[in-house]
Each structure stands twice: as structure tokens, then as C-alpha cells.
Amino acid sequence: MNFALNRSGPHNWMLGRFVVPAARLDEFYDNAKTCISPGDKTGWRLSVLAGENIYETISQITEFNKKYRPAFVCDQLEVRATTVSKIENTASSLPDDLTAYFEIPQKENFVELVSTLAKQGQRAKIRTGGVTPDAFPTAAEIIRFVRSCTAANVPFKATAGLHHPLRCFRPLTYAPDAPKGTMHGFLNLFLMTGFARKSFKPNQLEQIMEEEFEEAFQFDEGGVSWHGQDTLNILQIEILRRAGVNSFGSCSFDEPVEDLQALGLL
């Protein structure tokens, strides 16, 4: 498995959790159990995509952890929630060792959902792409999500469509006839979130999200600047990673690494 190879590779410090649907946990174990070496003391950390029945999902996770810890540990849960009650009921059922991220839609009750996450001490999730152009939210929609979470002190993660550091126009899948579209950059997202925490205006944040040229961002030991003027220092970046955007998900590990190497950042 690629994940097993990447865990022992030179950039394993960048690697987070393996994402697996709750319904496929047993299938995952059957395929991954031979990838654990006897000397592996850390084990695989898993983020589980919840099924329709959240109580059944939590039960599956609890049983899985009892059987296979410490080689495999489910310590994150990703839940789709469209109502306040879904967030509240899930939060009240979570074991202490399971952190949840709630994927919430930007509909009429969006602000109420973010407020509920804040009250419950939970985290949010935003979907930033897919396999068709219409699956990608606009920069303005992402900024609204980020500013709302920032104002409510709700950390979040992002998933899908973030294979590349900077905004670009690329094929959306690996198929020969794949549709092409504009993909958001994970550096754009992280840095925009950092500047949102410094109370930048929406039009400035939109410019950061839509930057396509590496020269716009300058990195050094002290932090990162945008056009040589506005800066995020190391402490602000540390706080951003802890209390702002925690992680992003990508189908590919090689593409983000190779792109960062091409930019001279690795």
C-alpha cells in the first residue's frame, strides 16, 4: 500500500491519517495487517467516514480499536451534519479518545451550525473540490467558511481537490479524458486562513486564494510574507495550525510533495 511506503519515507512527518469509511473497516484491516512491521511502535492512525447511523459508526470504531490497537487506531471521525441536532447528538456520544470533524453545508442555517460547533467544542470540515468542475466551491464560499470558523474559534480541516500548493488549472482526475478545471491550492488556503485570523478584508483574502504565482509568497526562517509586505510569523503559523486549519486531505501524497520540492520549499 502507498500509505505504508509513505510512512517509512523521508517525508513521513507530513503524512496524517488514513481515511476509511466505517463500513469498510474490516476490509481495511484484512488488506493492511501485513503492512505493520514488528518494530513499528506508532501504529496507523485512522480517520473514519461516518455512516448514516452515527451510533452504529461509533460502535464499529470502539470495537475496531479494542481488537487492533495499537497497530491501528481510529482517533478521528468525519461526519456530515445538516442540522444542529446531528451535531449535538454526535458530540454527546463521542468517546474521549475520538475527535470529530463535521462537514456542514453553507445553507440557510450555516451560521447556526458553526455556532453549535463552537458551543460543543467541535471542529468543522470543508469540501474544497471533487471530480467535476462544479464540485469546487468558489473562493468567496471558502472565505465565508473560514471567516465564520475563525470568528467562532472553530478549528477545521479541508478535503478534496487540494493536490497542488497553488491555484492552478489541471485535469481533475487521472483518467486520460478527465475534465479540467481550476483547483484551489493548499498553500493558498492555509495562508488565506492565517491572514483571515489577522482580520484581513474579504477582497484581500480573495486575492490570496486566487494567487497562482509562487513569487507572491516569500518564505524564510521567520515566516511567510505575501508580496513582501504582509507577514505571518512562526508563532502565528503555529497558532494557525493548532487553532485554525488543522490539516488537508488529498488522494495523492506524491503530488503535494513533488510540487513543494519544485517550489524549493522541501
Residue ranges and their predicted role:
Residues 1-266:
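Expand to "…catalyze enediolate/carbanion chemistry for C-C bond making/breaking, isomerization
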